[in-house]
């Protein structure tokens, strides 16, 4: 069957359902596809179809994730739903499912629970900009005041983690009721999607951001100079533009891109996603290496000390058999290179067990081009034992 062309006429947004186990995330995902399918904007996916999430591998970690897509009048959405709590933690920290916004599902029968809080914290750490709330199972609560209390609790919780608790849309509904076609609850799903359309900002496309390309390989063309190859991570680069070589050394070095080529063809410019070779003026083979990045001057700096949110793999996932402690020195893999670093655990945390999610300080032995939101893996003897996201650089 021929593949359908991807429709670029609508802005594309990545969202996901988050919240405590059994509060109705997957049922809500199914309900959204059903309500939008009736308007011609989706293909209906039932609960079993979404819950039976395929395994994916990201940074050497197996994650179960379901992806569904649907359209509203204004946007095209890719929606992720994870069956288990650990899958959310891994998904968000590895960036396997980049989220431009979240739908926080809270059962009105229960109110906020431990994973509700944990998912909000994770969303804050990995930089999810906005959260819309869906109070589910409202058909099972007779007392309106009870729902008011739950809403207040959720708003307070969002505010506690620096989200807009006062301004966030909170929709009351029943995902199961909507799946069963009850008009009142179908209307709640329509209200939810209108809120998502309006409240969650359209993300800046990768190609509109500032230029950055991790260096994967370096070689010399006799008579022409040094070429750095890699995949453009974001932004665009034109021939004769100035770039900086950043990382592994304290001082960034400026140079000019005098030529670009892809698949042996010359280019005037390259953009996010392109695998290119960049010819660099006045740079000798020894002064650039894999693990550095080419970037728009002044946009990224090399750092050795950072705060990070880290997930330690379980033994079954190929992680460590035993916990690690303060001053642990593994390899930290950023973009294209491994650098040794030392782990400094927060006060009160003596050790990190396989399967734990922890905030820590990392001190690298060499400076690396990193910024808030940069993803990395933690490796030991060539195998991945953890994944992390930079929360802040120091």
UniProtKB/Swiss-Prot annotation:
A Gene Ontology cellular-component term: cytosol
Q: Which residues form the tr-type G domain?
A: 10-204
Which InterPro entries does the UniProt record give?
EF-Tu_GTP-bd (IPR041709), EF-Tu_GTPase (IPR050055), EFTu-like_2 (IPR004161), EFTU_2 (IPR033720), G_TR_CS (IPR031157), P-loop_NTPase (IPR027417), Small_GTP-bd (IPR005225), T_Tr_GTP-bd_dom (IPR000795)
Positions of the region G2? 60-64
Q: What is its main location?
A: cytoplasm
Q: Is Repressor found in the keyword set?
A: no
Amino-acid positions noted as binding Mg(2+) in the UniProt annotation, renumbered to this chain: 26
Do you know which HAMAP family this protein is assigned to? EF_Tu_B (MF_00118_B)
Role played: GTP hydrolase that promotes the GTP-dependent binding of aminoacyl-tRNA to the A-site of ribosomes during protein biosynthesis.
How does the record describe its quaternary structure? Monomer.
Which NCBIfam families did the record assign?
Answer: EF-Tu (TIGR00485), PRK00049.1 (NF000766), PRK12735.1 (NF009372), PRK12736.1 (NF009373), small_GTP (TIGR00231)
**Any idea what this protein is called?**
Elongation factor Tu
Q: Which organism is it from?
A: Mesoplasma florum (strain ATCC 33453 / NBRC 100688 / NCTC 11704 / L1) (Acholeplasma florum)
